[in-house]
Amino acid sequence: MEKDKHSHFYNQKSDFRIEHSMLEELENKLIHSRKTERAKIQQQLAKIHNNVKKLQHQLKDVKPTPDFVEKLREMMEEIENAINTFKEEQRLIYEELIKEEKTTNNELSAISRKIDTWALGNSETEKAFRAISSKVPVDKVTPSTLPEEVLDFEKFLQQTGGRQGAWDDYDHQNFVKVRNKHKGKPTFMEEVLEHLPGKTQDEVQQHEKWYQKFLALEERKKESIQIWKTKKQQKREEIFKLKEKADNTPVLFHNKQEDNQKQKEEQRKKQKLAVEAWKKQKSIEMSMKCASQLKEEEEKEKKHQKERQRQFKLKLLLESYTQQKKEQEEFLRLEKEIREKAEKAEKRKNAADEISRFQERDLHKLELKILDRQAKEDEKSQKQRRLAKLKEKVENNVSRDPSRLYKPTKGWEERTKKIGPTGSGPLLHIPHRAIPTWRQGIQRRV
């Protein structure tokens, strides 16, 4: 396609080289902008891809520490923000491209319909003109036979470019359609500019002035034709009355030859005038009939053209709807994939959080268990050391002496020792401890 395009451009005549160079420059700018945008998108996607790879690598070696979990959370938030930003940017770009595409399609369809209208309009108008010209002699339709208002209207059409005001039929019909929709209010200008992208506001305003004058002259033309028809009908009735009167009047023979000659001459003049008036009336009627036939054929052609345009618009709408539906399905599919990836990443994040939490819990339990075991072992070792010390103290070779059970203990002997008075005064009473009942009556050995 590129080779065919370049060969087509460079094989053209030198008269169109300027336009071709402008198109080529515009194309180079568009290519450069597409490359720049592609590089930017690839850079963003590469950054997101690298972040996802880093996250996957981190998830392979999970560490149950708060710092590690916080690091994973920050990485996932960064990836999610990057994906959301990328989606929002692409959505805005996509909407802008859709608007530009719709505008371009409208302009292309309008230009295409204009070209079709020109081709069909020229051929059909030429056929109709030839058919009417073959039926009506040219010398029969003269300006002198038409009313002044009709001549003014025809002159206005010739000077301003016909019934469309130098516009093509498609643009003029859209202008009239929108104007009738708004009933001639000034607010219809904006909608006309939307329907006619190739026209400026000044051109639309000038056409509106022309159309107002066109309607006024056309109304005057209709009124003058109606008045002219009424006058012609009255003249026709007078001529018929004179003719009937002349036919019914008996021919009088006068004696004088001059009177008869004058009377005949007057009758011939009246008849000649009546015939000429009748011929003029017939020629005017014929021209009016031909004009009405031409107008009817134009109306039929306009109806057919409108029907073709309607079918073409329906086809464009159907194609646009199909394309839009495909693009919407593709967008939904991509959005679903991105959402599923985000959900999987969220699940992996939650799983990593749960794993780290379980590992922390298990590690805490393990530490408690180890501490408990260590405490038990320490307690056991201390007990063994204490028992060993006691054994060292207690283990003596003592002979058995059953009689020692009945001997007083060292403490008892110390208690029974006589202790002299320590005070300066006489000791009157020394309190003694109570003797248990089971020892009462037992003689104390000295």
UniProtKB/Swiss-Prot annotation:
<feature type="compositionally biased region" description="Basic and acidic residues">
    <location>
        <begin position="255"/>
        <end position="268"/>
    </location>
</feature>
<dbReference type="GO" id="GO:0034451">
    <property type="term" value="C:centriolar satellite"/>
</dbReference>
<dbReference type="InterPro" id="IPR039902">
    <property type="entry name" value="CCDC148/CCDC112"/>
</dbReference>
<feature type="coiled-coil region">
    <location>
        <begin position="219"/>
        <end position="400"/>
    </location>
</feature>
<feature type="coiled-coil region">
    <location>
        <begin position="35"/>
        <end position="116"/>
    </location>
</feature>
<keyword id="KW-0175">Coiled coil</keyword>
<feature type="region of interest" description="Disordered">
    <location>
        <begin position="390"/>
        <end position="430"/>
    </location>
</feature>
<keyword id="KW-0963">Cytoplasm</keyword>
<feature type="region of interest" description="Disordered">
    <location>
        <begin position="253"/>
        <end position="272"/>
    </location>
</feature>
<keyword id="KW-0206">Cytoskeleton</keyword>
<dbReference type="GO" id="GO:0005737">
    <property type="term" value="C:cytoplasm"/>
</dbReference>
<protein>
    <recommendedName>
        <fullName>Coiled-coil domain-containing protein 112</fullName>
    </recommendedName>
</protein>
